Amino acid sequence: MMWGAGSSMAWFSAGSGSVNVSSVDPVEEPTGPATLLPSPRAWDVVLCISGTLVSCENALVVAIIVGTPAFRAPMFLLVGSLAVADLLAGLGLVLHFAADFCIGSPEMSLMLVGVLAMAFTASIGSLLAITVDRYLSLYNALTYYSETTVTRTYVMLALVWVGALGLGLVPVLAWNCRDGLTTCGVVYPLSKNHLVVLAIAFFMVFGIMLQLYAQICRIVCRHAQQIALQRHLLPASHYVATRKGIATLAVVLGAFAACWLPFTVYCLLGDADSPRLYTYLTLLPATYNSMINPVIYAFRNQDVQKVLWAICCCCSTSKIPFRSRSPSDV
């Protein structure tokens, strides 16, 4: 999609070589009033389908959080921010497909590249904010539920979305390679230098998340040991509970790394002459991160599951008993 030159993503080829600025093989200028639109390739269709699934999943999460008054706690605000970002990413993929292969508008395609850059940045930023919130809820357990927590949540969300908006506007307003394809990176029309900056920012975020989750593991192990001693539980019970908690954190961080690390590394190593196939193969898992985020951060929550069951049964959600849950449960 956004990695095709000109008005489309279809300067893709299975091997390396010079960049083709047209969407298909060179053709004569059209003699009629109609504009020749490129034909989508299999990878383009797969990404469009992925965008549709991402949009549907996250639209459901947004609808649940907005439509359920009980979901106004800071942790649900952060999950809602993540869902909105992933929803924009899914819609951006679908609309970019339409802009390239149905409308043929280079200007619309460029704007949607900015939307995708903003959405994916906001998604990663929201994941970092959720990690920070989880850590603080355990580190400052006694003072977590206060007005300060709400204020801090809004500040984090503001920083995430302002930063994402800035990074999304950069390729639209100035920093792109539409006028100089030799400066392009693996994703058109983002320049190589721009992608390097984004990759470095990702590694910084990933490093912070890794450090915070390591601290969370230490706190969880210490708390589990203290509870086991107070309740005179067997050591086996302590280790089982601790191992389960650490396994959950490993799944959360591992899914994030598996989805984004291949594409980020490829952005650093590749350039405009790199095989287009590798761009698709590394970018597709990155879109899957927006597909699994609702499962990890929303649908696993028991209160969200209650609302889903109520919706499926056409029942009112106003009488559903919700229990107080900490961010580490989300």
From Swiss-Prot:
One of its GO terms (cellular component) is plasma membrane. GO terms for molecular function: G protein-coupled receptor activity. Residues 63-74, 133-153, 218-245, 300-330 are cytoplasmic. Glycans are attached at N20. A lipid is attached at C313 (S-palmitoyl cysteine). Residues 1-42, 99-110, 174-198, 273-277 are extracellular. It holds the Pfam family 7tm_1. The modification Phosphoserine is found at S324, S326, S328. Constitutively active G-protein coupled receptor that maintains high 3'-5'-cyclic adenosine monophosphate (cAMP) levels that a plays a role in serveral processes including meiotic arrest in oocytes or neuronal development via activation of numerous intracellular signaling pathways. Acts as an essential activator of thermogenic adipocytes and drives thermogenesis via its intrinsic G(s)-coupling activity without the requirement of a ligand. Has a potential role in modulating a number of brain functions, including behavioral responses to stress, amyloid-beta peptide generation in neurons. It comes from Mus musculus (Mouse). Belongs to the G-protein coupled receptor 1 family. CDD domains: 7tmA_GPR3 (cd15963). The chain crosses the membrane at residues 43-62, 75-98, 111-132, 154-173, 199-217, 246-272, 278-299. Expressed in both the forebrain and hindbrain, with the highest level in habenula. Lower level expression in the testis. Expressed in several metabolically active peripheral tissues, although at lower levels than in the central nervous system (CNS). GO terms for biological process: positive regulation of cold-induced thermogenesis; regulation of meiotic nuclear division. This is G-protein coupled receptor 3. It is a multi-pass membrane protein.
